């Protein structure tokens, strides 16, 4: 396995400074944000698609630091009633760019439709009641399977071998059953981006999920989570309070190692090794208490320390 950093982890820095921090942290790969939910602060998708010199410049900057592209990230809302069409084009653009850069994997999200033709936002159904909600969910699955059958074929035509869905709440594909459902319908090009942070707050077991998914694990995000027990006790995990006030929330994203320690991360990495996963472990830093740079560096340091204790793991240029 190989340490990678998602470039939005250092979104406040210029591309030059961001790549310097990533290399300094000990990573050997980057997951490049190309648009969708991200503003893509380090690259311009249209320019890279149309300008070979711009692509060569990017590759040169990576090579100079001993970095490679582990994946392109186009996490998006492809069925959003307002911005869905735009995001579908971003996903297709990411697939085209991946082919030009000889990258075989994109990281994205399934999306979630609204509740009808006049919707203004998504409608995520997570509870099997009332019955009209279940009927809506069934219609949403038809729409989702149609869209991703088309997008998977488009990706295959452009050399994409893996489409990694982040198992993320507010999207139709968010857990093991939903991932396996869409993978069964479309095929093995579809797999999971396993991010433990989103699983923790829903009380899923990331290690059990790794074993259940097996070779359907296409990508891994390293992000931690910490519960605020006082707030959890009175508000529960379904907490709609803003991330701008972390002290008032039931849970918050944390730098790897600051929410869970070796008791989780060691068996998690061993589980990945056990299913034969030999790809990037990509840091995604969203810690409200750390700066972008410090959170990324601390996450890398912790992850490399844990990985160094796991036998026969090639995890960085230094180990």
Regions found by a protein language model. Name each.
Residues 31-32, 69-74, 104-111, 162-166, ...:
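Short beta-strand segments at enzyme active-site cores
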Residues 2, 29-30, 72, 134-258, ...:
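Acidic/histidine-rich catalytic cores of soluble enzymes
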Residues 16-38, 102:
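Catalytic domains of carbohydrate-active enzymes, especially glycoside hydrolases
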Residues 32-57, 113-117:
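Glycine-rich, proline-tolerant flexible connector loops at the mouths of alpha/beta enzymes
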Residues 16-17, 21, 56-57, 61-64, ...:
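Active-site acidic/histidine proton-transfer and metal-coordination neighborhood
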Residues 6-10, 33-37, 74-77, 111-113, ...:
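Active-site beta-loop-alpha junctions enriched in small/polar residues
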Residues 27, 98, 103, 160, ...:
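A structural motif
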Residues 292-312:
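C-terminal helical cap(s) of enzyme catalytic domains, especially alpha/beta-barrels
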């Amino acid at each position: 396995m190989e340490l990678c950093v998602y470039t939005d982890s250092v979104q406040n820095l210029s591309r030059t400074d961001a790549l310097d921090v990533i290399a300094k942290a000990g990573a050997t790969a980057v997951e490049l944000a190309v648009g969708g939910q991200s503003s893509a602060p380090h690259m311009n998708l249209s320019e890279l698609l149309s300008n070979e010199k711009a692509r060569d410049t990017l590759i040169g900057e990576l090579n100079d630091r001993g970095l490679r592209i582990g994946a392109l990230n186009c996490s998006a809302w492809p069925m959003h009633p307002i911005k869905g069409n735009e995001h579908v084009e971003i996903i297709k653009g990411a697939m085209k760019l991946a082919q030009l850069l000889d990258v075989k994997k994109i990281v994205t999200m399934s999306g979630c439709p609204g509740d009808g033709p006049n919707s203004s936002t998504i409608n995520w159904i997570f509870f099997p009641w009332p019955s009209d909600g279940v009927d809506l969910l069934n219609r949403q699955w038809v729409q989702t399977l149609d869209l991703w059958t088309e997008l998977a074929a488009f990706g295959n035509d452009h050399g994409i071998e893996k489409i990694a869905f982040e198992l993320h709440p507010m999207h139709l594909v968010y857990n093991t059953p939903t991932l396996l459902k869409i993978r069964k319908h479309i095929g093995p090009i579809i797999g999971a981006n396993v991010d433990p942070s989103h699983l923790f707050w829903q009380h899923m077991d990331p290690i059990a999920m790794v074993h259940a998914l097996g070779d359907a694990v296409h990508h891994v995000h390293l992000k931690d989570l910490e519960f605020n027990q006082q707030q959890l006790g009175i508000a529960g995990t379904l907490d709609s309070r803003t991330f701008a006030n972390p002290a008032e929330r039931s849970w918050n994203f944390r730098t790897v190692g600051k929410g869970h320690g070796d008791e989780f991360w060691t068996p998690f990495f061993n589980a990945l090794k056990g299913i034969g996963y030999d790809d990037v472990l990509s840091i995604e830093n969203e810690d409200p208490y750390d700066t972008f740079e410090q959170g990324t560096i601390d996450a890398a340091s912790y992850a490399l320390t844990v990985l160094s204790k796991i036998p026969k793991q090639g995890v960085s240029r230094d180990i």
